Each structure stands twice: as structure tokens, then as C-alpha cells.
Amino acid sequence: MVAVFRLAPPEAIEILDQTLLPFEEQVIRIADVAALCEAIGALRIRGAPLLGLAGAAGLALAASQNGPTDKDLSHAARVITATRPTAVDLGLRAGDALELALALPVDERAGALWAYAARLHGDRIREDAAISAFGADLLVERGSVLTHCNTGEL
């Protein structure tokens, strides 16, 4: 199975294009904030927790590629959040990442943001595994599942 989300610091993040599922599994490499915003707006990235992870990773991308100045990071956080203003986790995690970065010296920001995104990613993997283990016990041999909003690791 292809991973839904992968960090590739400091150059990029990789996502599974969810608009093509279930017929095709295509990984997209995202190397800048503009490409991330396009992917979020086009619903290639879906689900509240994954959108939150994308918001944090987007700030890490911005710090690595555009410079980690207060102005650049604040702009990146606003642009990312504006792509899906009703996606609460997106705005929360982008805001948390911005707050973390602004409290640090400029030369420490990119590394700290990638570490924050990695921690969120690890949390997501563990939570998805727990949801899957719990849900597996509820399925019968040939049961059906209807997902709503957060499909976890699909």
C-alpha cells in the first residue's frame, strides 16, 4: 500500500492523490507552498488530521525554501490556511507551527518545523493504527464500510 503522506525534508512532501482513488494510486511530490495550496484546494489531501499535518509541513517547506523570516512564515501560514478556511485542523496546525517558529532564532526554524511535522506524522500513524485495530473487530468476513470525512490511512 502506498503511504498517504510522506515527509522528504528539506525539499518536499509527498502525498497520495486522493481524487484518483480507488482506481489509481498516484504519489505527488509537493515542493513549495503554492503546490501544497493547489493540492489542498483540489481535495487531493483530505481528512482533518491529514490537513493539519499538511499545514505544519507547509510551514516547514516555507522555512526551508523561502527563508524563515517572520514575514515569510506569517504569509505562508495565511495562504495555507486560506485554502480551506473551514478546515479547523489545517489552521490550527499551521498556526501552531508558526507560533513555534517565531519563538526561535531564524537559523533554527526550518529544522524545528520539520521536527514538529515529523512528530505530528508519527502521532497520525499511531492513531490510524489504533483506529484500524479497533475497527477490524467490528467487521464481518464480507462486511462493508462507509467512511465519512477522516478515512485515516485509508
Outline where the language-model segments fall.
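N-terminal active-site beta-alpha-beta segment that forms phosphate/nucleotide-binding
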Residues: 44-154
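Short pre-catalytic strand/loop immediately N-terminal to key active-site residues, enriched for Gly-Thr
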Residues: 41
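Positively charged, low-complexity intrinsically disordered leader regions
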Residues: 1-34, 38
